[in-house]
């Protein structure tokens, strides 16, 4: 009940076989170098090309970690003259990436269109004065609440305000959209996302991440992402293993169908029993409880010890 393994790929026999064979052939260390030096292989390039095609972008670039990658992407995309506008409920990697920004930044109320517009107006005024641009950041799926980001409405606002849209779709990739390409595909606005980011830690049941965008943006990021320039390339076990995972995700829509069968059964069952799961419209299923932390811990322990159900609590 607390796992990231949305599609069940972690224990899929073909995945385990691919991981085992990659480990036997390459070990844990290879390649011994950064991508810009000696760490580039045909498998890294193949995975990037397949990921870009899957999420309908021109180019993609592999990242060693999701959290670290997003922090570095934000740092690379803006200068002190630029303005960042982002959702107040953004993931920690977004918040920490924004903290590195030496220019102005504004938060808007969670998924609130009116608040978005108000802050875009403020950002536009400042960017006009500084000669900079605006980076707008949101999530495809908010991992605590389970709501989709209002991507379609945000993309529509690009007609009125001049900004670049960065979307963290960690929970949408593989779970939403006709082909599993994420929240942008689900909302029919994938083309309007300028910079698309996702991790391998959810649907792909692996370690690593990627960013996808137009080729000129990716070429720029390759030489400006400090988290990648000064780190080894993604190991071969993760790279080759991710190729197999992506193949299974792409070629087996039944994986996503089964996920949603389970999600609907769970969410409908919880609602029918009177549990408050908010207004989630994704696989993320929060159960909001009133009471104290000690009471919540008693419930968690009871479910684990007496019912064989393991879950976690999140405290605000």
Ranges and model annotations:
Residues 195-197, 204-253:
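Conserved core segment of the aminotransferase class I/II
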Residues 17, 24-65:
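Conserved N-terminal alpha-helix of the aminotransferase class I/II PLP-enzyme fold
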Residues 161-162, 182-200, 219, 223:
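Conserved active-site segment immediately N-terminal to the catalytic lysine
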Residues 29-31, 36-37, 280, 284, ...:
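Conserved PLP cofactor-binding pocket of PLP-dependent enzymes
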Residues 9, 257-267, 272-306:
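Conserved PLP-binding catalytic core of the aspartate aminotransferase-like
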Residues 1-29, 163:
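N-terminal "arm"/small-domain region of PLP-dependent enzymes with the aminotransferase-like
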Residues 5, 106, 110-166:
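Active-site phosphate-binding strand-loop segment of PLP-dependent enzymes
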Residues 73-92:
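Conserved PLP-anchoring active-site segment centered on the Schiff-base-forming lysine
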